[in-house]
Every structure is written in structure tokens, then in C-alpha cells.
Regions:
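Short amphipathic alpha-helical segments
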Residues: 17-23, 139-147, 151
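A short, structured loop/turn motif at beta-sheet edges
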Residues: 18, 43-47, 72-77, 97-107
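Hydrophobic ligand-binding cavity/cleft-lining segments
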Residues: 1-50, 161
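Glycine-rich portal/gate segments that line the openings of hydrophobic small-molecule binding cavities
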Residues: 43-89, 146, 150-161
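Low-complexity, charge- and small-residue-enriched intrinsically disordered regions
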Residues: 3, 62-64, 132-146
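Intrinsic-disorder/low-complexity, polar/charged segments enriched in Ser/Thr/Lys/Arg/Asp/Glu/Gln
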Residues: 5-11, 48, 66, 78, ...
Length: 161
């Protein structure tokens, strides 16, 4: 089994009300508009949300992966997306926890994890076997960190206007 794992976790204080922060993070169009490498997100008739993400890896180049996720939790404390039932190859988990600091300030704890599983490296990309799991995982970690940091920066700017 050829497995690539990557993730990123961070915490940020946003000078906006809990209600506005939750509303922002509940709207998936904000992810498409503000998170780099997200090419599209759509929800099908069965309630499964499909994220299409571009992955750039040195020595290999760019490739696109689709992640099917479902909303596991959405309330005033937390939003969590988990892999859709039956998904075995492209696993994406995203969560945001909301902690009010004051009436006009909210702390948000982010976590995004991705896992790509293939029976053989060539199923992921013809050159994946040459790069190996650790190099690709390391580059994906950098990519996810960059995606989330950029998204959080843009979200903070928009919410604090």
C-alpha cells in the first residue's frame, strides 16, 4: 500500500463575533474563493460534498485529486467534515472549533488532514514511486499548511473589516 499523509493545525483570534465567524466558515463558497489549490467544491443530491484540489509536488509536477466528504458536525462550537461513507482512497478531514473570547472576538482552532491511499505508487502518479511516500507527504504537508494559512489570513481580513 502506497500512503501519503499530510496535515496542518493552527489557532487564530479573529476580531469578529462568534455568529459572524460561524456563518463565514459554514459557507463553502468561501473555501473556493479564498483557499489556494481548491479548484471546485460542490454538493451532490445525496449530501456528499466533493472537493477538487490541485497538488503540486517537486519532481512529479501537478496533479488533481477529488475528495468526497460529508458534514459530520455543525453547531456553535464546531464544524467538521469527514470522508464520505465508503471512501477508501482520498480521505480529507477538516474541522474548525469556535471559542468566543469576547462579544467581538473569536478564537478559531483549525485542523485539515489529507490521506491518499493507493495499492501501488504508479496509481497516484507515474513518478510517485521515484519520489517516495516521505517526500510526497512532506511536500503535501507544506502545501496544506500554505493553503490553510492563506485561507485563514484572507478570512481574518474579510471578517475584521
Amino acid at each position: 500500500m502506497f500512503t501519503i499523509r499530510a496535515g496542518y493545525t493552527d489557532q487564530v483570534e479573529i476580531k469578529a463575533s462568534l455568529e459572524n465567524v460561524i456563518k463565514f466558515f459554514s459557507d463553502i463558497k468561501n473555501f473556493v474563493e479564498m483557499m489556494p489549490s481548491i479548484e471546485s467544491i460542490h454538493t451532490d443530491g445525496g449530501g456528499v460534498t466533493h472537493w477538487r484540489i490541485r497538488v503540486d509536488v517537486p519532481f512529479i509536477g501537478s496533479f488533481k485529486e477529488k475528495f468526497a466528504v460529508q458534514l459530520a458536525e455543525e453547531n456553535e462550537d464546531r464544524i467538521e467534515w469527514i470522508p464520505a461513507a465508503g471512501e477508501k482512497q482520498n480521505l480529507l478531514r477538516y474541522s474548525a472549533e469556535f471559542m468566543p473570547k469576547s462579544a467581538d472576538s473569536t478564537v478559531v482552532q483549525f485542523s485539515q488532514n489529507a490521506e491518499l491511499r493507493r495499492a501501488a505508487a504508479r496509481e497516484l502518479h507515474p513518478l510517485a514511486g521515484l519520489a517516495g511516500e516521505s517526500i510526497i507527504s512532506g511536500e503535501m504537508n507544506k502545501g496544506i499548511a500554505q493553503m490553510v494559512k492563506s485561507f485563514v489570513r484572507k478570512a481574518k481580513e474579510k471578517l475584521e473589516k
